[in-house]
From Swiss-Prot:
The keyword Protease does not apply. PROSITE patterns: RNASE_H_2. The gene is rnhB. Residues 18-209 form the RNase H type-2 domain. InterPro entries: RNase_HII, RNase_HII/HIII, RNase_HII/HIII_dom, RNaseH-like_sf, RNaseH_sf. Gene3D superfamilies: Ribonuclease H-like superfamily/Ribonuclease H (3.30.420.10). Its cofactor is Mn(2+); Mg(2+). It holds the Pfam family RNase_HII. One of its GO terms (biological process) is DNA replication, removal of RNA primer. It catalyses: Endonucleolytic cleavage to 5'-phosphomonoester. It comes from Shewanella sp. (strain MR-7). PANTHER family: RIBONUCLEASE H2 SUBUNIT A (PTHR10954), RIBONUCLEASE HII (PTHR10954:SF18). This is Ribonuclease HII. A divalent metal cation binds at residues 24-25, 116. GO terms for cellular component: cytoplasm; ribonuclease H2 complex.
Amino acid sequence: MAVFKTLTDADMAIFSTGLVAGVDEVGRGPLVGDVVTAAVILDPNRPIAGLNDSKKLTEKRREALFDEICEKALSFHVGRASPAEIDELNILHATMLAMQRAVAGLSLTPELVLVDGNRSPAFNHAGQALTSHSIVKGDGLIASISAASIIAKVTRDREMDALDAAYPQYGFAKHKGYPTKAHFDAIAEHGVFDQYRKSFKPVKALLER
């Protein structure tokens, strides 16, 4: 498969038999909240049917798979970067930091890390440098990355639901913090609070009025 062109023979051997962590993120585009990432090491002896890119799954299916991943995975961990860190570092570097935190938090040391997308940060676990590769559209190709995308997506969606309960006037349960017309209208009427990413242009423009 073309997806494996970047993997060496040694990496392929690890992919087939070793501890492989899949990593993905959610929440780079929203105006509010953390960017959330997850790292997952699946158990090859306990396969999970139906794993796919979280965006291609219904909410009900994501929730069911979330529970199954939590039960069956050898290890998983959620990493995040806060709005303040996003504002300080920029969204790309904050996302890389969140991914590093997700991998560092695993209870097992992976032999290989596969990251969705076209770039990967340097990973360390318990003081050990790890081999990693980025896989374009990996969340639809690699089971462990699919699992990570589901863990990250469900985690962040639940956080947006909690934010919606605290600030119902913003409609977070519907738009999940993304820059929709309804969200812009709510910001124009009610302003922003500390969970907003103040470096993002729409928020910055409002604050500079």
